[in-house]
C-alpha cells in the first residue's frame, strides 16, 4: 500500500473530490434523481469496495450519497483510496448517463 501522489490528488479534486483534514481524507457528494437511485448506488459501491478490501464511510440521503475515503490503518490517503474514488466516479457516470 503506497501513498497517494499529488498528481492523483489533483485529478480527484478536478473530479469533485474535496480534501479534508489536511490531506488525510477525501469526500464527494453524488446526486441522484430520487432515493431509489441513491440506494442503488450504495448497493453498487459494495462489490467494488469488497474487491479492494477497502470500505468507505457512506451517508445516504434522499437524493444524494456522501462518500468519505481514508485508510484508517495509516491515518491518511493511500492508493486504495485513489482506486476506489476512481471506481466510484465510473459507477456514478454509468448510473447517470
From Swiss-Prot:
GO BP: tetrahydrobiopterin biosynthetic process
Example GO molecular function: 4-alpha-hydroxytetrahydrobiopterin dehydratase activity
EC identifiers of the protein: 4.2.1.96
Name of this chain's protein: Putative pterin-4-alpha-carbinolamine dehydratase
Keyword list, A-Z: Lyase
Protein family according to the UniProt entry: Belongs to the pterin-4-alpha-carbinolamine dehydratase family.
Leading EC class: lyase
NCBIfam families with a match to the protein in the record: PRK00823.1-2 (NF002017)
Keyword match Membrane: no
Catalyzed chemical reaction(s): (4aS,6R)-4a-hydroxy-L-erythro-5,6,7,8-tetrahydrobiopterin = (6R)-L-erythro-6,7-dihydrobiopterin + H2O
The keyword Lyase is assigned to this record: yes
Amino acid at each position: 500500500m503506497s501513498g497517494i501522489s499529488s498528481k492523483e490528488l489533483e485529478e480527484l479534486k478536478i473530479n469533485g473530490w474535496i480534501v479534508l483534514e489536511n490531506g488525510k481524507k477525501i469526500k464527494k457528494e453524488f446526486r441522484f434523481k430520487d432515493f431509489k437511485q441513491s440506494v442503488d448506488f450504495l448497493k453498487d459501491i459494495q462489490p467494488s469496495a469488497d474487491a479492494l478490501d477497502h470500505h468507505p464511510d457512506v451517508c445516504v440521503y434522499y437524493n444524494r450519497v456522501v462518500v468519505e475515503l481514508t485508510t484508517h490503518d495509516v491515518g491518511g490517503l493511500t492508493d486504495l483510496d485513489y482506486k476506489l474514488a476512481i471506481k466510484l466516479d465510473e459507477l456514478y457516470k454509468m448510473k447517470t448517463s
